[in-house]
């Protein structure tokens, strides 16, 4: 599944924590640590070659500190103009044929916020590779350790019954290491109470069918149907269920025209308080039912 993982780092404590956690990713065979040297717009003199060499030395120190037996670890540093960091990450991910990009929600920026930093946000919006976003809010409160222990221990999967969501679920079904899967459908449309109730009934029946099918393969599955705003209800359910990860398709029943990510997936990834795995629609086409 995620045999080759790319981790962009800025050498912050948050980025180092992501590196420590990545060993729990199922099927990991190769790890590439990437540092992007961005030009300081205020600097009159810039020596990208020297900065890349210095970055490579620091990356080697990071590599030597990783204790993940059986995993091939490589390092890479590239230089770009300021503001092109996210593009550089995407380019390297494509060139290296990475199966997953794992990164923190924000880096060295000292402004405390639940929302994503600019680099993570741009990789989320414009990237084509599956993306795992680790949340730093948990690290600051000291609670991130439990998610590092087993990122896939309890996974919340929002299901809107769209083709991309079904493909993403099929992808998860074939992934080893998931302890428990929580299926969630949010009924957000209905002109009358009767329409809403009918939507809830239909969704509950569909989720029950899916749960029974997944349970046949030995997976522990629970499901729930709620009424409300999808983004708010997904965040609420993740807290109430105390999940270790939110996993969802990059696009659902309503997708941004010509975009790489739908509004619900974007808003959840941007504001969730725990790790979020975005499964790119373009990468899971083979799982379409």
Model segments located where?
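Glycine-rich, Arg-bearing micro-motifs that act as flexible, cationic patches
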Residues: 103-126, 248-271, 285-289
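Hydrophobic alpha-helical segments and helix pairs
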Residues: 94-146
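Short secondary-structure boundary segments
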Residues: 35, 105, 136, 185, ...
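Structured core of small recognition/catalytic domains
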Residues: 179-244
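General small-molecule cofactor/ligand-binding pocket signal
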Residues: 32-34, 74-79, 132, 182-184, ...
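Small/aliphatic-rich secondary-structure junction motif
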Residues: 1-50, 150-195, 212-216
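Intrinsically disordered or low-complexity boundary/linker segments at protein termini
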Residues: 1-17, 73, 125-170, 270-289
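Structural beta-alpha unit
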Residues: 67-101, 140, 215-246, 254-255, ...
